[in-house]
């Protein structure tokens, strides 16, 4: 007797006539006049539930089987048989069924067998994994996570665990969550009346990280090729479908590399991940194509087969100015491109993924390498049809004097970045990397447009439930 997953049965791992046990939850029950019940049981291992054909001669048929409703947990034992119905090759002739847990009040069970709005499910994040859509998102998210680790491992990268608590603001934006154990009712004060953070747990003002990049650079400048993959935090008071206060970032960093190397790495990684999900999670993608985004599969296939276009920011501005599109935000040199501009370039002008390079220095971070023109930096954004920016990256400034000048320009303290400056003092080397917002990637693959629906427990302004 083998305890197995539903996915293994559908893969054909068990011959017709095999005795197996499947454990999971009831999605639906249908009773026939012939005294047979049909149970759809899922365990999360794949999109489709397996059908269990339950005869009325089981000893618990009347007092338990006929009381099963959506959400009840069961252990189902029986024989693998060919399914005469459409939609799946196998089903189970059940010889034993154990009810592990009933749903207390089926009439008030929030996840009863009916379709709910995605907004309703967001309020029940602890139960929404039981639905088709969130279960499919979770499997795709897992597939993409595994593909990312596999890609970098195959390329010889070392995964580095960067700290979640930091005293550095990577973006220089100041939108950070403060970490403190000070008593809010009795804050220590300096002679000037400001909060005395020397009395705090870390002896200085500390925050949740907005990026692992600066820390990753230190390891890239010793181990050559590294990447981080972990949570990051932004205290940005934006209540939109594109923003989260807590999200995951993938950040590779490569020594002896320039901006073109980073762009090639981004292209290779995205195509690798999309190929993986097309091969491994076809069942879930077919659901998304049917219910969420009809081009879900075709879009990924087109992406994988596309050559990335490359264009300078200055040329992109000229293209946007020359087009007859009525943009909400005016286009002029020096602006940070908005989503509408990004999507026009990727979807209408190039009709392919686009790498926009060499942005004005005044709209980019201090650590990005200053170009010879003195006006732009070696920064890039990867724009994807259907979503816009999906990756942002740069070649890092490896020249200490130029880095110091940029810090001064942006009124940042050399003292705060002493360790980062040391990398330029002791065997400096050109290096480059990028950041991929993982939830944005999951959103792109699934077609689920609100980023709060592609992370298990979303954190956003005024919302930290569960």
From Swiss-Prot:
Belongs to the class-II aminoacyl-tRNA synthetase family. SUPFAM superfamilies: Class II aaRS and biotin synthetases, Nucleic acid-binding proteins. GO terms for molecular function: asparagine-tRNA ligase activity; ATP binding; nucleic acid binding. The gene is asnS. GO terms for biological process: asparaginyl-tRNA aminoacylation. Homodimer. HAMAP family: Asn_tRNA_synth. This is Asparagine--tRNA ligase. Its EC number is 6.1.1.22. InterPro entries: Aa-tRNA-synt_II (IPR004364), aa-tRNA-synth_II (IPR006195), aa-tRNA-synth_II/BPL/LPL (IPR045864), Asn-tRNA-ligase (IPR004522), Asp/Asn-tRNA-synth_IIb (IPR002312), NA-bd_OB-fold (IPR012340), NA-bd_OB_tRNA (IPR004365). It is an enzyme of class 6 (ligase). GO terms for cellular component: cytoplasm. It is found in: Cytoplasm.
């Amino acid at each position: 007797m083998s305890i197995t997953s539903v996915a293994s049965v559908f893969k054909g791992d068990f011959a017709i006539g095999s005795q197996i046990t499947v454990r999971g939850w009831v999605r639906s029950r249908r009773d026939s006049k012939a005294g047979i019940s049909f149970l759809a049981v899922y365990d999360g291992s794949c999109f489709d539930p397996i059908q269990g054909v339950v005869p009325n001669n089981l000893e618990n048929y009347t007092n338990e089987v006929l009381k099963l409703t959506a959400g009840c947990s069961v252990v189902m034992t029986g024989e693998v048989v060919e399914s005469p119905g459409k939609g799946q090759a196998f089903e189970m002739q059940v010889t034993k069924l154990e009810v592990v847990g009933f749903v207390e009040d089926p009439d008030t069970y929030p996840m009863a067998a009916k379709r709910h709005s995605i907004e309703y499910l967001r309020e029940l994040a602890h139960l929404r994994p039981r639905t088709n859509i969130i279960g499919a998102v979770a499997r795709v998210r897992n597939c993409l996570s595994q593909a990312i680790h596999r890609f970098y491992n195959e390329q010889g990268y070392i995964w580095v665990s960067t700290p979640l608590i930091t005293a550095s603001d990577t973006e220089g934006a100041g939108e950070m969550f403060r970490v403190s154990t000070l008593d809010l009712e009795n804050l220590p004060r300096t002679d000037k009346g400001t909060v005395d953070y020397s009395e705090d747990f870390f002896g200085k003002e500390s925050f949740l990280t907005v990026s692992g990049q600066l820390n990753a650079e230190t390891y890239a400048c010793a181990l050559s090729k590294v990447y981080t993959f972990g949570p990051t935090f932004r205290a940005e008071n934006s209540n939109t479908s594109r923003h989260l206060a807590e999200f995951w970032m993938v950040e590779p960093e490569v020594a002896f590399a320039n901006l073109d190397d980073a762009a090639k790495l981004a292209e290779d990684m995205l195509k690798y991940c999309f190929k993986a999900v097309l091969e491994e999670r076809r069942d879930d993608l077919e659901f998304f194509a049917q219910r969420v985004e009809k081009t879900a599969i075709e879009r990924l296939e087109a992406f994988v087969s596309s050559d990335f276009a490359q264009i300078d920011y200055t040329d992109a501005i000229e293209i946007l100015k020359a087009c007859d599109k009525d943009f909400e935000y005016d286009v002029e040199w020096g602006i940070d491109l908005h989503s509408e501009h990004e999507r026009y370039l990727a979807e209408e002008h190039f009709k392919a993924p686009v790498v926009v390079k060499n942005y004005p220095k005044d709209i980019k971070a201090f650590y990005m390498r200053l170009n010879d023109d003195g006006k732009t930096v070696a920064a890039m954004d990867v724009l994807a049809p259907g979503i816009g920016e999906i990756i942002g990256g740069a070649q890092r400034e490896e020249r200490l004097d130029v880095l110091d000048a940029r810090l001064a320009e942006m009124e940042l303290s050399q003292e705060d970045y002493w360790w980062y400056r040391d990398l330029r003092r002791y065997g400096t080397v050109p290096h480059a990397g990028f950041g991929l917002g993982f939830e944005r990637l999951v959103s792109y693959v699934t077609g689920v447009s609100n980023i709060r629906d592609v992370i298990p427990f979303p954190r956003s302004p005024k919302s930290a439930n569960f």
